[in-house]
Amino acid sequence: MESQQLSQHSPISHGSACASVTSKEVQTTQDPLDISASKTEECEKVFTQANSQQPTTPPSAAVPENHHHASPQAAQVPLPQNGPYPQQRMMTPQQANISGWPVYGHPSLMPYPPYQMSPMYAPPGAQSQFTQYPQYVGTHLNTPSPESGNSFPDSSSAKSNMTSTNQHVRPPPILTSPNDFLNWVKIYIKFLQNSNLGDIIPTATRKAVRQMTDDELTFLCHTFQLFALSQFLPTWVKDILSVDYTDIMKILSKSINKMQSDTQEVNDITTLANLHYNGSTPADAFEAEVTNILDRLKNNGIPINNKVACQFIMRGLSGEYKFLRYARHRYIHMTVADLFSDIHSMYEEQQESKRNKSTYRRSPSDEKKDSRTYTNTTKPKSITRNSQKPNNSQSRTARAHNVSTSNNFPGPDNDLIRGSTTEPIQLKNKHDLHLRPGTY
């Protein structure tokens, strides 16, 4: 019966989209070629949905051998479907670059959901664990984000349960320039922390709290590829990906170190712009401070030539050192070492002048001490002719009174005086000398 109905109609052309229909589907009296174009499109949609929900039956089993039916080898049968995604959007090997990242013009052209970048390491059931992003996922980096900011909280406070991920976490923006990569990483780290992955992210002071799982590594790779397009990655990031295109954690660690370095660079340049020196501190300390700043900037890829460095230094000089701003204006090739040589010379002259002033300046108390010392050292000592000590039982006044009495009332031949030739005579004079009577 079925063969008679097929023989009554004209043969099916090789280009028909319904060439793979089964014998049960052609039991209608209407010629399948007379179906309108709208019904044909509807048939194709139904057919596509049917193939996506149930395994496709091989053409050899679907179409029985019939001499009046079109040959299945010559008919253009639709390509078999590979999962729920159309074949024409699958990533081909030609779409991958040397670093392993597929080349997409825009994330909306992503052939897989955000967490199925490649079938080779898409874990089973990964789609049910992570958030599926809506169509506004393609925002740019300059779009304001509530999670964006220059600082992010400590990753130790984040949870690690991926099944409880916030369903309303805003995704990071799309990277549009290599110069904005570090700013993009700040927002991306904030996004990971809001997705309960903060404890797998290392910081500048410590390593990650725990090691990530395979599902979390897949999540990291997928989101990084989705929002950081390969053509906008810096060179050093591409170098890391060329070795291992899944080593996203190394990229994040190096980015954090670069952020810290950039902060130090800003501080160093600010310090150079606000230098101040007036000789209150040693010249060696000032030179060491400036030299360390210049060396740090040079090591971080920001070399400062001698002309600019000398301008920074001279602008900070004040007081007597302000003269150095104009002392070497004729020298075009002046170096930082030459300028510091002048600063050292002026500092030594300043210190020598201070020492000389302190030497010539004398206080009144020091002058009194010097005068007293001079008087004591020039006072003559008393001289005695006899080794016998004088009698000190009487006072000096009494002895002088006795001598004067004996002079006023002398005895015959001055017996009193002659009788005491061995005793010294006390004379009241300004030198307080003790003389013998014979020498008076």
UniProtKB/Swiss-Prot annotation:
Pfam families, sorted: TYA
Q: Does the keyword Magnesium apply?
A: no
- Compositionally skewed regions (Polar residues) per UniProt: 1-31, 137-168, 373-409
Q: Which GO terms describe its molecular function?
A: RNA binding
Tell where it localizes. Answer: Cytoplasm
The ranges of region (Disordered) come to 1-75, 137-174, 350-440
Return the annotated site residues (Cleavage): 401-402
- Segments carrying the region annotation (RNA-binding) are 299-401
Q: Report keywords, A-Z.
A: Cytoplasm, RNA-binding, Transposable element
Q: Which GO terms describe its cellular component?
A: cytoplasm
State if Protease is listed as a keyword: no
Biased composition, class Basic and acidic residues, residue ranges = 363-372, 429-440
Q: What else is known?
A: Retrotransposons are mobile genetic entities that are able to replicate via an RNA intermediate and a reverse transcription step. In contrast to retroviruses, retrotransposons are non-infectious, lack an envelope and remain intracellular. Ty1 retrotransposons belong to the copia elements (pseudoviridae).
| Protein function | Capsid protein (CA) is the structural component of the virus-like particle (VLP), forming the shell that encapsulates the retrotransposons dimeric RNA genome. The particles are assembled from trimer-clustered units and there are holes in the capsid shells that allow for the diffusion of macromolecules. CA also has nucleocapsid-like chaperone activity, promoting primer tRNA(i)-Met annealing to the multipartite primer-binding site (PBS), dimerization of Ty1 RNA and initiation of reverse transcription.
- Assembly notes: Homotrimer.
Q: What is known of its domains?
A: The C-terminal RNA-binding region of CA is sufficient for all its nucleocapsid-like chaperone activities.
Q: What is this protein called?
A: Transposon Ty1-DR2 Gag polyprotein
